[in-house]
Structure formats: C-alpha cells, structure tokens
Amino acid sequence: NKKVNIRIMNLSRNFTLSELIKSDTAIRKGINNNPNAEQIEKLKALCENILQPVRDHFGRVKVTSGFRSVDLCLAIGSSANSQHAKAEAADFECVGVDNAELADWIKDNLPYDQLIVEYYTPGEPNSGWIHCSYIEGTPRASYLWAYKSEGKTKYKPIIGKAKDLV
C-alpha cells in the first residue's frame, strides 16, 4: 500500500492536485485542505472536462480557488454545501482573456453544471473571474452573473452572451 504524494499528483495533462487545493487561508489558519479519494476523482473530472479544455483553447489558466474543505469554506464565510467543498468547482481566469469571452466559450463548448461570471464589470475585461462546476450525470447548465448591489451579492441569469452584459 504505497503512499501517494498528493502534492505532485496530476489530475490532467496540465493540472496538479496541489494547484487545486492551494489555500493561503488554510495554511495561515492551520486548516486541513486535503481531499479524500472520492473528492480527488471529482477534481480529476473537473480538470478533464472543464479546466484542461479551457487551457488547450486559451493557454495558461490561473486557478484562484479549487477544492475547499468544509472547515475552509466556513472559515472564509462560504457555505459548507458549496460546490468547492464537494470538489466540483473552481474559480479561475486566463491571463489576457476577457472573462466574458472566456465564459461564453465555456457555455458554447463544455458540459458545465454551473457557470458564474463573478463580479465582472462590462467594459473592463480584466475584472472578476469565472466560477465553473462540473458534475457527473445531467448538469443544470446554469449560466449566471454575480454582482454587488447595495452591499450584497446578487445573481442574474445570463440570457445569450456574457459579452453583451450591460
């Protein structure tokens, strides 16, 4: 029964487990952010079906948040039921690519469950980031824009293209 070094484990051709579990908050607060075997399989599916195709099309993908243990989710004010805690979601950007263009490409080409253009300001291509989840089975194909209004995060369905948001 050989112990696997999860830090260098490949999830797909260009993504490692360490990239998907890295958290400065977890390190600072001493929170265990290591996924179990089932969660690692879900992260592989996320990489193979979403992140790797995005990288193949656009180039470098900067993952800002991947797997978050329930304890980490609670520590940052997120939900214990977050798709990040289920190893089904990642937040990311592609350097030099407008986040609306990136989201529209994912919508048109990949089997996402939930796709959220987070805190994107139309006309500011570098604003915000993409939250995308993948699940086995039938995805919801939920396409949303998250934005701040009166100090709260609001969600609005995107009908058509994110690049047409006003």
Identify the residue ranges that each predicted region occupies.
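Structural recognition of the beta-strand scaffold that forms the well-ordered cores
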Residues: K62-T64, A89-C94, H131
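Extended, low-complexity, intrinsically disordered C-terminal regulatory tails
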Residues: N49-G77
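Acidic, His- and aromatic-enriched active-site or binding-groove loops in soluble protein domains
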Residues: N81-E101
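Short, flexible, solvent-exposed loop/turn segments with mixed acidic/basic and small polar residues
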Residues: A75-A85, Y120-G123
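Extracytoplasmic cell-surface/polysaccharide-interacting catalytic and binding patches
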Residues: V4-R55, K148-V166
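Catalytic cores and adjacent binding grooves of peptidoglycan-active enzymes
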Residues: I6-I8, C94-V166
